[in-house]
């Protein structure tokens, strides 16, 4: 019965499975797959082209070459199906079986499987506890290994050379011990392993071991032993006796013209194995000398190695053309391998591609499709319509008609295409908006027409770009294309929720021109009653587009009634106002202003939020046409006189030249170093360039009046730049200011700037200097694209299975959000950061009532309420703290940014996050920034109040210095601004030595300066009066006189001192002697400290004793752009990483070592002190006796994310990663919502490391999924046993992708061999829960519409199971029905 069903639908048999398992194949298993043994290396007969019998293409084993025809031709046609020909032994069946039938080779001697030998860590090596080197010596016949020592003093597993073996046999007798060589010996050893006892011994050893490194090794072995026990694999299966041969159609041999053959490399590799195997058999039959047989066995081992993984060991086997042969492993690996080439990327039917051109008269949901393309793409639909209408009798006739292009065909094509969306795609598809659906409009010509507004989503322009068209065939596909992918449904960008359908370039210029207002235009002050009169006045020339007039515009009130409102405006703005949808939340004021590109985007955003999608689409289309029309009417153009070179340029340049000359002189006199001079010169020139640019912008913006008092036209270049249509201030600066500084190829800046601009023209030397940068720019762009693409791929891989799975996980945890400020400027306001997130706490109003309850999804209205109350920090839900299994919940994720509504269940938020972060990757820079000179000036050196309030000091000790200033003494102190109701509004850390301008409890206004400090040095301040004594400060050993470069005043500076052997190390410090009580305080001085007091000098409290230069004041390279983003996502340890205090406590200094010094923190709670070893060259940010808080830097630098996680927890880590990554994107002006970064960080935090096993099966130090860990603990607690303990760990995105549950997903990402080896040993099961696995096995992904199908299947399955159980209970006495038994093993039968 099944046979017949499968014949009708050959795929049916493989459809129902719900997981895939991979494991080692036993020899019996391999033989059971096989249809026969391959004995000869021959392939096909060169004269008859028929396969040789028993050869690699044998028809008897693999099946017939032609359908239903045996090899000799005795049986032909269907009627003989299933008969085996007695003459040639071939079964009569379909030739397709040659794609699925396997053969095998029986090896004359066992060989080791190279994956389990060489894929690190070597599995065979771990099981036998042998080193890989030793194993290889045995396997490749260099040394013997003792298998059973018997009563001899030899050790088991001991290696013996040939001479040693003979000696031992002479000494102890041949039969007293057994030794072997090659894979046979290893196989015996593996067979002899008792895994259960091995496991017990290892666990015992683990309990009693004392050393540091031993447990790691034991745990490694234990894991391998356990995985063999649990998976039911046998260790000896890693040694092969039988080799499977893949079906011949998968390694084809094709005759080329000219009598030659093209063949797959695998045939060569198999042939090599068969040849060596047959020769070995023959030699063994002939009883050849041992040495010859051994050599042949070694060659067989090498041949099998090459077949499985060519080049993994020894020489790579090459073919006739010196090209390495592609082995079975290479077939899977890399971009060209099976996974990425064929399973994850497929070519599709019904697609075409062509050049694109603009279609400004199209509606937003349309695209222009060339008739020729449409005819080809929609052929089957046309045939069926022709048939349905009875126009063509047969399919053949229909084909003819279409080929001849009769006029009926065009009418039918119009019908077929109506309301049938097509999908357009532009490569590279960096985010989901790279494929959108449109309704096709038939056009003449051969180019696809694209709507101008969707260009920014596709990143398309019309300089020869090509796009591909795909036709969704089934009704479901058409429905999804229309509902989900239609361009009108994708108005907002999924990355930041801002509109992506925004006018650009000409449209912006037209709208900007239209919204301009000018003084003294004709008709100024006219009163026009309505739009009709405005049109009339414009047509007769009574007013211009820019005249100030008073008119009335129709508006809608909240009840939806229309009324006329009187406004002061211009005719141009009235025209714009006509396009606005009628809604009381979108009043005329929205566009009654000068509109730049950013403003237009805001208008579209407002319209979308308040009036919905349909109105927005109509508005966008209308505003686009207006923009084009008036850009054309305005006729804006510019000539060289529009580039105004500022008059002040000459003077500014001269002034700077004099300054540079001055620095040069200081350098000649030895007052400043080369580096200092370089920094100052560059600083001076970059300031000069900026000032010239400022002057130029002033002159370009100036509005001049004509003799009649009318304003003359605005400078066209300024209009283009200011409106955001084209160009920027930086580009105008090069045209009319000065080009400024250029970089060398190495990335350093050339000291001589380019003083000319493009209008004046460059000198030869200037031109030459500017060529470096241009060339480097082009080289960088090429590298950037590849790097950015790879980052996106890693991000998608780590987050692909993160899908919204439920409405609310009910977690108690939350993230606290504050506004991000830098130097008193708000970079990202609180409102921006919490918009579209779920509240995790009640928000109290000023009246003490709940203003917004917990669990609210915050929209724009709520944000306004929060800002009005004046709250500074809000707790919200985040994907990071979500406790859903197998995904995130809708409440933790919040708003779906691309729709502006709560996120749907089934949304693939992980992939969206990855695309949102990866897509702008190409806009990031590749270079590392050189900070110094100019950049130092913007180092923050003061603190301002961000809001009105009362000042409070928290943990802040202060002292009045001799000048009467209030100085901060503590490192961890904060100033807090408190509102009238006592609520904390803002808080800031205060640096040591900062001068506080207000006292505790003062009322301050927004913008008041609270504190200021020197951004370049950290002072050492005394807390009491006394006499200073120098200790261990010896001239020319630990102390030196240096002349200050800028002022010429000499200073005493501490230098690094290495004590000679046997001498006591010097520890330079200052002590403060108090008159009555002797020594009161010690101040350790690190190298580079400048001492400000003399030996024996009397000082007052608050005196600065010494100054340490801050790291940030030095010129240093900071990684920026793409490399920085990658570094953060890969969770790499930074080069100069900061050391973080793990506990709060007091600092002490311990003993000094050769290059390190010991810093000890004594915790406040009296627990064990914690010690750190710090390089002496580093500046320690704390003095003896200082109190540090947990998480404070002991040494400045970039913190290591792993430390932050360990010391401060998940929330702090998230905050750090989000802010660091956002900073890079913000520099480039790219907006990405925080939740995307949080989603990726969540995927990096899915694992925990076991610290204490308790009664669980986990091993200490093992990394397990958080979900598994929690499930095991819940089970242990319910049984009253001791649960395991663990700490969260952070994995980089590459590592996290390789450690996902799904081995299919991991194997298709990177390191395919390693992943598959590991999975096979563990007998891993892939439950196909992620997106990637499902794409690979060819199913609907469990996200989006596929998620609904999955849910239905799960409910149906559970219902079936319940029914079956009920039936069993009822029919307990009766035998089960036979038909049912066919499907009982397939849980998916419900489908």
From Swiss-Prot:
Domain of life: Bacteria
Binding positions (Mg(2+)): 461, 463, 465
Keywords: DNA-directed RNA polymerase, Magnesium, Metal-binding, Nucleotidyltransferase, Transcription, Transferase, Zinc
Gene Ontology molecular function terms on file: DNA binding; DNA-directed RNA polymerase activity; magnesium ion binding; zinc ion binding
Cofactor: Mg(2+); Zn(2+)
Gene Ontology annotations of biological process type: DNA-templated transcription
Binding-site residues, Zn(2+) 2: 809, 882, 889, 892
Pfam assignment, any one: RNA_pol_Rpb1_4
GO cellular component: DNA-directed RNA polymerase complex
Catalytic activity: RNA(n) + a ribonucleoside 5'-triphosphate = RNA(n+1) + diphosphate
Record flagged with keyword Nucleotidyltransferase: yes
InterPro entries assigned: DNA-dir_RpoC_beta_prime, DNA-dir_RpoC_beta_prime_bact, RNA_pol_asu, RNA_pol_N, RNA_pol_Rpb1_1, RNA_pol_Rpb1_3, RNA_pol_Rpb1_3_sf, RNA_pol_Rpb1_4
EC annotation from Swiss-Prot or TrEMBL: 2.7.7.6
UniProt function note: DNA-dependent RNA polymerase catalyzes the transcription of DNA into RNA using the four ribonucleoside triphosphates as substrates.
Subunit comment: The RNAP catalytic core consists of 2 alpha, 1 beta, 1 beta' and 1 omega subunit. When a sigma factor is associated with the core the holoenzyme is formed, which can initiate transcription.
Family classification: Belongs to the RNA polymerase beta' chain family.
Protein name from the UniProt record: DNA-directed RNA polymerase subunit beta'
Organism per entry: Zymomonas mobilis subsp. mobilis (strain ATCC 31821 / ZM4 / CP4)
